[in-house]
């Protein structure tokens, strides 16, 4: 039952979260274990590293090919990029290709199973990441979240989080309290029409961030659907352009804020 005192802004994951394409390519990163949790590590070229760490919180497909290729792309822009398997091997890719191909898969039940545990896994993972990669005090952390990862980005931009700036694409499972508690600069990249994140919800996010004078930016793309940034239909030139613009915008946002003293 919804909490009337904490209105939903981005609705729970739905079948629209399972649409889109799997991309092709050869990931260049590697999987390591951080205190028992699979972690994808994409390293920047030492000649171009900016010395900062980017935490990647994936959509329901977890550490699948699309996520790995995106993390490699962020690493190519200078960030040591780390992605967490907060589904512990039970991501949607275990049951579904694109489009959904397992008629017995119950997305609502799967989401209920993982919603709170994934938050706790992410919280402990971040603590371990900071201990491993941030102890010298010189490293700055940023974060990126797609769909499922949106609220975890907002948590990391709140008191108790470690990130100086973050970015979110086509969110799900976000309540007003997640936005209210966030403090660090945040960027959004969203479709103009999204059944999970309505125009009214977008407007409310803008109102909240404006009222509390939080630094924010919001890209809104027409004629794309939920998932356009992470499961882009590469045969659609406009959708591919929107994906590239979202990526460029996120990099410029992170570069600006993580360069600040």
Swiss-Prot record:
Q: Which Gene3D superfamilies match?
A: alpha/beta hydrolase
Q: Which domain of life is it from?
A: Eukaryota
Record protein name field: Dienlactone hydrolase 1
Q: Which family does it belong to?
A: Belongs to the dienelactone hydrolase family.
Q: What does this protein do?
A: Dienlactone hydrolase; part of the Fusarium detoxification of benzoxazolinone cluster 1 (FDB1) involved in the degradation of benzoxazolinones produced by the host plant. Maize, wheat, and rye produce the 2 benzoxazinone phytoanticipins 2,4-dihy-droxy-7-methoxy-1,4-benzoxazin-3-one (DIMBOA) and 2,4-dihydroxy-1,4-benzoxazin-3-one (DIBOA) that, due to their inherent instability once released, spontaneously degrade to the more stable corresponding benzoxazolinones, 6-methoxy-2-benzoxazolinone (MBOA) and 2-benzoxazolinone (BOA), respectively.
Extra facts: Fusarium verticillioides possesses 2 unlinked loci, FDB1 and FDB2, necessary for detoxification of antimicrobial compounds produced by maize, including 2-benzoxazolinone (BOA). The FDB2 cluster arose as a duplication of the FDB1 cluster with rearrangement and expansion by incorporating additional genes.
Which effects follow disruption of this gene? Retains 2-benzoxazolinone (BOA)-tolerance and metabolic degradation capability. Does not affect the virulence against maize seedlings.
Q: What is its EC number?
A: 3.1.1.-
Upregulation details from the record are: Expression is induced in response to 2-benzoxasolinone (BOA) exposure.
GO molecular-function annotation terms?
hydrolase activity
Active site residues according to the UniProt entry: 147, 194, 226
Q: Quote the pathway field.
A: Xenobiotic degradation
Record InterPro entries: AB_hydrolase_fold, Dienelactn_hydro
Query: Lineage in the entry?
Result: Eukaryota, Fungi, Dikarya, Ascomycota, Pezizomycotina
Keywords assigned by UniProt?
Answer: Hydrolase
